[in-house]
């Protein structure tokens, strides 16, 4: 049953036209629903159906980049801690992921009244690094190691309804929501990087 907030995690396809995956979690860590979509109009309908007053969306995909930069400034915060990242810059986007969905999704959500990097008390959306979240919260270093024990780790964290997660895309979507709960509990795990147009949860500074 939904509370006053719906926490939405998205494992977003980087290239437009590919399938994206999502989860909806309530404030009590119960996994209410999983879904997938290809068109943003489908996502819009799903969001409209959510009865909760406040909707917070955590997106596992780049939502901003600086032209001419090999490594994004926000991603460097993970590298400083010795944590690997998925490289992303203008050249990579144009070569492998054009047309790129992340930038379109950002414009779409802003047009619907969502605030980029807003507070948890208003409809807001944020960029996250899903496996980076897992590395910081669970101390795992390899994705394969996490996937061997993902259900126990997430259950011990407090999530319920995990039987709905049928593939790794849904798991990544759920991992995307971790910053909300960790920050809500006042643990010093994440900082919100808000510089140069970025809005990414990074290792605590």
List PLM regions with ranges.
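RNase H-like (RuvC/DEDD) metal-dependent nuclease/polynucleotide-processing core
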Residues: 2-8, 12-205
């Amino acid at each position: 049953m939904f509370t006053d907030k719906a926490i939405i995690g998205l494992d977003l396809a980087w290239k437009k036209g590919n399938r994206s995956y999502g989860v909806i979690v309530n404030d009590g860590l119960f996994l209410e629903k999983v879904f997938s979509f290809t068109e943003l109009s489908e996502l819009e309908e799903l969001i409209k159906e959510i009865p909760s007053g406040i909707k917070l969306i955590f997106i596992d995909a780049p939502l901003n980049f600086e032209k001419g930069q090999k490594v994004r400034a926000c991603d460097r915060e993970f590298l400083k801690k010795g944590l690997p990242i998925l490289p992303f810059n203008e050249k990579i986007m144009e070569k492998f992921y054009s047309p790129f969905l992340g930038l379109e999704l950002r414009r779409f959500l802003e047009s619907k009244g969502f605030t980029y990097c807003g507070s948890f008390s208003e409809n807001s959306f944020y960029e996250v690094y899903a496996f980076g979240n897992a590395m910081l919260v669970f101390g795992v270093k390899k994705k394969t190691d996490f996937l061997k024990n993902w259900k126990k780790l997430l259950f011990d964290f407090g999530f319920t309804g995990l039987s709905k997660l049928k593939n790794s895309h849904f798991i990544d979507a759920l991992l995307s929501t971790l910053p909300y709960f960790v920050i809500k509990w006042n643990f010093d795990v994440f900082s919100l990087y808000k510089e140069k147009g970025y809005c990414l949860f990074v290792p605590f500074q």
